[in-house]
Each structure stands twice: as structure tokens, then as C-alpha cells.
From Swiss-Prot:
Role: Responsible for the ER body formation. Regulates the number and shape of the ER bodies and the accumulation of PYK10 in ER bodies, but is not involved in the expression of PYK10.
Protein name, entry field: TSA1-like protein
Compositional bias (Low complexity): 561-585
Record organism: Arabidopsis thaliana
More about this protein: 'Nai' means 'nothing' in Japanese. Homologous proteins are found only in Brassicales plants.
Any single Gene Ontology cellular-component annotation: endoplasmic reticulum lumen
Polar residues composition-biased segments: 466-487
Induction behaviour: Induced by NAI1.
Length: 772
């Protein structure tokens, strides 16, 4: 165990020392003291681990006598009592020997999960540090740097809290003894997990070195992605090892170990809430820089950080489930156990619902929708998350009340548990405040968009009023309508450009000679609709145009009356003071003063620090000189519009850039669809050819089968005639053999007759001879 702690401490010190350099470049000297403190604490922990290794070995040798083997299952008797009392209890009751078997590995299992939390926090610190370096190089915004510094301090506090839990588990593990076989098995599994962590740490070091070099090309991005996937696989293998280590032990425990497991449960809950707060801060930070649509690399980096925190949520949820399984076997009353289990299930459901909502909010935040419907949806999701956290807080408060009334825990454990639960409540309150801040920022963004729209409306109204004041009073209403139509021509052109359908596979298709062809005739043409509507309306104006003309005429009359009154008063003043030399000198001095401003543009004039004094001087000059047109009053009206012109141009540029990006995305998707469609078309043609071949083969097979039927019938008839012919041939052969046999008999009779005749002839000759 000491070797494992030493290796882990050294790897963490290497990572922290590396991050020390990154944080120095990012945050300056603000966070040096905090990182030095963390590094010093870890060096102290490594030294203490080296000293405790000998103590672990001596205590292990002293407690080997309490080992009992039953069916290849090793049971260890571990307790906080002295060694003599433990030995007596192991001799008296064998049931108590198997009651605490899993407690040898459970704290170490929790220790391994806290180590996973360390690695996750280290990843988050490194990514936040590299993010800080890129942000400092790209922008010198003090507010963004302060927010990033605040987030890093919060993560450092979480890291210190996890370090305290690590020290507590180290102390608990040093007071326990292990059996030889079980210790060897655990040591081998822990060594394998350590190797996985070392490999992941080396990967992180390599990633950090690549980030410091400032390489941002595609090859570096692919290499980074590959290394991140490798690190993720290493962590998954370590998690599997932890699961195997957890299942290798039994499932019974005593009251003291139950209290320790409950402390581990509270620690994991605090880690979960701290990670939730970190995610909220990252989302707030992401929301403040959302308007920078050109910073794709920053968006990808933010997305990777959110994914890392979500993986940390999943790891904590797995630990939560493990501790819940342990809580199933607690030696307490059935009613109390069932009640506690139901409360834990409720809290887990609340956390899972909050995690799902955070994932959905993450996806919505990665997309770039800015309309009011999207803002309302985000607000509703934030309110739902807030309700989930409030429900979880209520469950924790009820759990705290039940723990305060329990009789099995001592005063020290109760006090420590209350302190931990109060810390959880503070974390929940911080998360709620973060949600409220995010909601307020969303409302501010919505108000800003509304103010932008109002500014556009005021600008359009001011332009219309200026045009109306400069024209003749006998202007035709149709001319006003034409002016309004011209002023909105750019917007209509933009709408026509957006409503124009893209050619490709996604459009409507008509059959043509060459196959499928996009049907663009069904697109919406605003010009044709407007022309048709104007033809239907004829020469008369519509209701909205009439109301607009009435509004313009009323405004013209009021303006004319006001100008007439001002001119009348100025004429009277001029008539009363025209003969005064002081008035002439004032007019001349004002004219000379105003002529000095000829080199300034309207925008420079509005941004001038003495703009109000210049407007006052110009107004006085127009009054004294009896000017026919009040240019200064019109210029004062344009003040707000000109000041907002720069912001409007920036917003227009952002909108154009966003439209360009969306167009590129749509074109890319269209190209993807075209390629997929071409592949589908090729596959369809190949399938058709195969179908034709199959049909031809089927026809040929049917023809061959028909021919086979004919051959079979012919063969049957031939075999029938052949059998008859065989019978006839056999009968003919029998008749032939009978005829041959009969001929042979006749021939034998003939030969006998011939011989008899010859003998008779010989006898007759001899008889005649004897007569002589």
C-alpha cells in the first residue's frame, strides 16, 4: 500500500509542478501561493506515506494470527479495538470474523475513487490553465481573467477538500492489517491500476507540452483527440479494475465501518456538488463569450471541458451506487434501513434528472440559436434544474434530521456528519446562486436584443421623419410608400436570399430524362407575390399604407407648426435685436466657432466631449440668424442613432458572419447528402442489376424444369415400351432355342437313318457277293 501511495503522490506532484508553470503564465503571481501550498502538502503526504509503510508492515504481521480460511475465502478481523481484544473476539465468535471481510478493501476502493477524482480535477485544472493561456493571448479582458481566476480558485478549494479525504483514508488504511493471499491479490490489482494512472499521466504531460508549443493545426488536433481517447480508455480500465476489486470481497460490515462508509458517501456527495458548481461556472463563462462565433477552437475546447466534467459526474454516480449497495447490508433496523434507502434513491433520481438537464443545456449552449423562444426554453430548463436542487437539498436536510436522532453513532461522529451536511448545503446554495446569475445574464442578453431592435426602429423612424421634413408638403402618398419600400429593400433582399431554396437532393424532385432533378420552381418568390397582390389591390392603397400616410401627414403638420412658431419667435427676437451691435458680434463669433468644426464628421461630432455645448451654440446661432431649417435639432435627434451605429454595424457583421457559417454548414450538409445520395443511387442500380439477373435465372430455371418434365415423361414412355420389347425378345429367343433343339433332334434322326441305310447297302453288297 505504501508503494502505491508513493507512486501516486509522485505522479500527482509531477502534474502539479507542470501545472504550476502553466498557471504562472496564465494568472501571473495571483495563484502562485495556492499552488505552492498544494505542492507542499503533497510532498508532506508522500513523506508521511514513506514513514507509515513500516508501520503497515508491522501491524500486518501482528494481525496475521486472526486469519480464518473457509472454502478458499479469507476473512480478516479488523476493528478499532486493541489487538489483544480483537484476538479474543476472533477466538470466541467465528461469525464476527466474516462480518468485516469487505472492510479491508472498501476504504481502499473509496480511496481509488478519490484518486479518480484527483485525476479528473487535474485534467480540469490543466484544461483550465491552457484555456487561460489561449484566452490571455487572444484577449486582454480583465473581467474574463478575473472570472477565470475565480473558477481556478474554486477548483483548488475542491482539490484541497479531496486531499483532506485522501489523508483521512490513508490514516484509516494504515490502522488495518491484511492477509498474505488477499494482500497479494489486492496489491497486484492496485499495481495494474497504478500503471493505468501513470500512462494517463504521461499522456496528460504530452498534451500539456503540445499545448505550450502553440501548435493549432489539424494534425495536432487529431493527435490530441487520439491521446484523449487513449487516456479515457486507461481510466475505463482502471474503473474496471476497481469494480473487480470491489466484487472480490464479501458484503458484511460492523457499525464503525458503516460510519466510515457514510463519511465516504458524504465526501462523494460534496465532490459531486463541487463539480456541479464548476460546471455552472464553465457554462456562465461559455455564455459570456458566446457572441464570438469565429472562435471555433475555443468552442471545441469548452465542449471538451464540459464532456470531462460530465464523465466525472458519471464516475461519482458509479461511486454513489457502490455505496448504496454497501448501505443495503448495514446492520440496523429494517424500518430505518428502508427509510434511508428510499431517501438515497430519491436523491439519486434528483441528481440524475439534474445531470440530464445539464447535458441538454450543454447541447443547447453549443448550438448558436439567439431567438426569444430559445431564451425562454433555456430559462425554463434552468428553473427545472433549480427545483431539482432544492428538492435534493430538502432530502439532505431530512437525512440530517434523521441522523441527529440516531442512537448508534457517537457524539463525535454526529458532529462531524453535521459539519459535512452543512458543507453540502453551502455547495447547493452556491450552485443555486450560480443558476440565478446565469438566469440574470440570459435576461440581460434578452433586454440587450430588445434594445437593439428598438434602436433599429428609432433609426428607421428618424430617417423617415428627416425625409418627410425635407420634402414638399404636397408630396404624393405613393412617393412616401416608395421611399419606405426603398429603405427596406436591403432587408427584403436578405429575406429573399434566405428563403431561396438550395439545389440538391434535399429539394423536391421531378422525373426527368437523366433521373432525379431538383425542382426549384416551387420556391417562394416574394417579388411575384407582391406584384400579384398589388395587381389585386389596384391603384388604391391598403389599410396599413393609409394609416402610415396619415401618421406621416400628422407628424408633418405638427413639425410645420412647431417650426413656424420657432421661426416666428426668432423673427421677433431678430427684429427686436437686429440693430444691436452685440447681437451681430455674437452671431459672428458663433459662426467663427462653428466653422472650426468643419473637419469633423457627424460620428466624431457626436463622440466629442463638448457635444452638448456645440449643439447649444448651433441652436443659438440658428435662432439669432433666423435660419429657415433647424439643422441642429435634426442633428440632436440623430445623436442616439449615430452612437448606436457602430454597435449596429458590429451586430450586422456578426449576423452576416453567422449567416455565412450557417450557409457553409448547410452547404456541407448538402454535399454530404449529395454524396450519400450518389452512393445510394449506385447501390440501387447495382441492386436492380442483381434483381434482373435473379429474374433471368429464375426464368431459365423454370424453363429447365419444364424441359426436365418433358424428358421425364419421354423417358417413362420409353421405359414402358422397352419392357414390352424385352418381353417379346425373350419370347422370340425361347422359340428360337426350341426350334434349334428340334432341328438338332431331326438332324440326329437323319444321320442315324443315313448310317443305317449305308450299313444295309453294305450288307446287301456282301450278300450279292456271296452268291457268286
Amino acid at each position: 500500500m505504501g508503494t502505491k501511495f508513493l507512486a501516486l503522490g509522485l505522479s500527482l506532484c509531477l502534474v502539479l509542478s507542470s501545472f504550476y508553470q502553466v498557471s504562472c503564465q496564465d494568472e501571473g503571481t495571483g495563484s502562485l501561493s495556492t499552488l505552492d501550498l498544494i505542492e507542499h502538502e503533497y510532498q508532506t503526504s508522500v513523506n508521511s506515506l514513506q514513514g507509515n509503510e513500516a508501520v503497515d508492515q508491522t501491524e500486518t504481521s501482528g494481525q496475521k494470527n486472526s486469519t480464518v480460511s473457509d472454502n478458499n475465502t479469507i476473512s480478516l478481523s479488523l476493528s478499532e479495538e486493541p489487538a489483544l481484544e480483537t484476538l479474543k473476539e476472533s477466538v470466541d465468535t467465528s461469525a464476527e470474523l466474516g462480518a468485516v471481510t469487505d472492510e479491508v478493501d472498501k476504504p481502499s476502493s473509496m480511496l481509488d475513487h478519490i484518486e479518480l477524482e484527483f485525476e479528473a480535477h487535474i485534467n480540469e485544472l490543466k484544461e483550465a490553465g491552457s484555456d487561460g493561456i489561449n484566452k490571455v493571448e487572444e484577449s486582454k479582458d480583465d473581467e474574463e481573467a478575473a472570472r477565470r481566476h475565480k473558477m481556478l480558485e474554486a477548483i483548488e478549494r475542491e482539490f484541497e477538500a479531496a486531499h483532506a479525504g485522501f489523508e483521512q483514508l490513508k490514516t484509516d488504511d494504515s490502522a488495518q492489517g491484511l492477509d498474505d493471499e488477499q494482500s497479494a491479490k489486492r496489491q497486484s490489482m492496485l499495481d495494474e491500476i497504478e500503471r493505468d494512472f501513470e500512462a494517463a499521466t504521461k499522456g496528460l504531460e504530452q498534451l500539456k507540452a503540445d499545448d505550450l508549443t502553440g501548435i493549432n493545426d489539424e494534425e495536432h488536433a487529431a493527435k490530441r483527440q487520439k491521446m484523449l481517447e487513449e487516456i479515457e480508455r486507461e481510466f475505463e480500465e482502471a474503473t474496471k479494475g476497481l469494480e473487480e476489486l470491489r466484487h472480490s470481497t464479501s458484503s458484511t460490515d460492523d457499525e464503525a465501518q458503516s460510519a466510515k462508509r457514510q463519511n465516504m458517501l458524504d465526501e462523494i456527495e460534496r465532490e459531486f456538488e463541487a463539480a456541479t458548481s464548476g460546471l455552472k461556472e464553465l457554462k456562465i463563462n461559455a455564455h459570456t463569450v458566446k457572441d464570438d462565433v469565429d472562435d471555433k477552437e475555443q468552442d471545441a475546447k469548452r465542449q471538451s471541458m464540459l464532456d470531462a466534467i460530465e464523465r466525472e459526474f458519471e464516475a461519482v454516480t458509479e461511486s454513489f451506487k457502490q455505496l448504496e449497495d454497501i448501505a443495503d447490508n448495514k446492520a440496523e433496523g429494517d424500518d430505518e434501513s428502508a427509510k434511508r434507502q428510499s431517501m438515497l434513491d430519491e436523491i439519486e433520481r434528483e441528481f440524475e434528472a439534474a445531470t440530464n438537464s445539464l447535458k441538454q443545456l450543454n447541447l443547447d449552449d453549443f448550438s448558436e440559436g439567439d431567438d426569444s423562444a430559445e431564451s425562454a426554453r433555456r430559462n425554463s430548463m434552468l428553473e427545472a434544474i433549480e427545483r431539482e436542487f432544492e428538492a435534493a437539498t430538502k432530502g439532505l436536510e431530512e437525512l440530517k434530521a434523521n441522523d441527529s436522532t440516531g442512537d448508534k453513532d457517537d457524539d463525535e461522529h454526529v458532529a462531524r456528519r453535521k459539519i459535512m451536511l452543512e458543507a453540502i448545503e453551502r455547495e447547493f446554495e452556491a450552485a443555486t446562486k450560480g443558476l440565478e446569475e446565469l438566469k440574470n445574464e440570459s435576461e440581460q442578453a434578452e433586454n440587450k436584443r430588445n434594445s437593439m431592435l428598438e434602436a433599429f426602429e428609432r433609426e428607421f423612424e428618424a430617417a423617415t421623419n428627416a425625409k418627410a421634413n425635407g420634402e414638399n408638403s404636397a408630396k404624393n402618398p405613393s412617393t412616401i410608400s416608395t421611399t419606405v419600400q426603398k429603405s427596406s429593400g436591403g432587408y427584403n433582399a436578405g429575406l429573399e436570399g434566405l428563403l431561396k431554396p438550395a439545389d440538391g437532393v434535399c429539394g423536391c424532385f421531378n422525373k426527368d430524362k437523366d433521373g432525379l432533378q431538383a425542382d426549384t420552381d416551387s420556391s417562394i418568390n416574394i417579388a411575384e407575390i407582391l406584384a400579384e397582390e398589388s395587381k389585386l389591390q389596384g391603384s388604391g392603397t391598403s389599410r396599413l399604407t393609409t394609416s402610415l400616410n396619415n401618421l406621416v401627414d400628422t407628424h408633418r403638420k405638427e413639425t410645420s407648426s412647431k417650426v413656424g412658431s420657432v421661426l416666428g419667435s426668432s423673427s421677433s427676437v431678430t427684429s427686436t435685436t437686429s440693430e444691436s451691435a452685440a447681437t451681430s458680434e455674437s452671431i459672428e463669433s458663433l459662426k467663427q466657432t462653428l466653422r472650426k468644426l468643419r473637419g469633423l464628421s457627424a460620428r466624431d461630432l457626436v463622440n466629442h466631449p463638448n457635444f452638448d455645448a456645440i449643439i447649444a451654440a448651433g441652436t443659438r446661432y440658428e435662432v439669432l440668424s433666423s435660419a429657415s431649417i433647424g439643422y441642429i435639432s435634426l442633428l440632436a435627434k440623430y445623436k442616439t442613432v449615430i452612437k448606436e451605429g457602430l454597435e449596429a454595424s458590429q451586430r450586422v457583421q456578426i449576423a452576416q458572419t453567422r449567416a455565412k457559417l450557417l450557409k457553409e454548414t448547410a452547404m456541407e450538409k448538402q454535399r454530404t447528402v449529395d454524396s450519400v445520395f450518389a452512393a445510394a443511387k449506385t447501390t440501387a442500380q447495382r441492386g436492380d442489376a442483381l434483381h434482373i439477373r435473379i429474374v433471368a435465372i429464375k426464368k431459365l430455371l423454370a424453363k429447365l424444369e419444364a424441359e426436365k418434365v418433358d424428358v421425364d415423361s419421354k423417358f417413362t414412355s420409353l421405359t414402358t415400351s422397352l419392357s414390352e420389347l424385352l418381353k417379346e425378345a425373350s419370347q422370340a429367343y425361347e422359340e428360337y432355342h426350341e426350334a434349334v433343339h428340334k432341328a438338332k433332334d431331326e438332324q440326329a434322326a437323319e444321320e442315324f437313318a443315313v448310317e443305317t441305310t449305308k450299313r444295309a447297302e453294305h450288307i446287301w453288297v456282301e450278300f450279292l457277293s456271296s452268291l457268286n
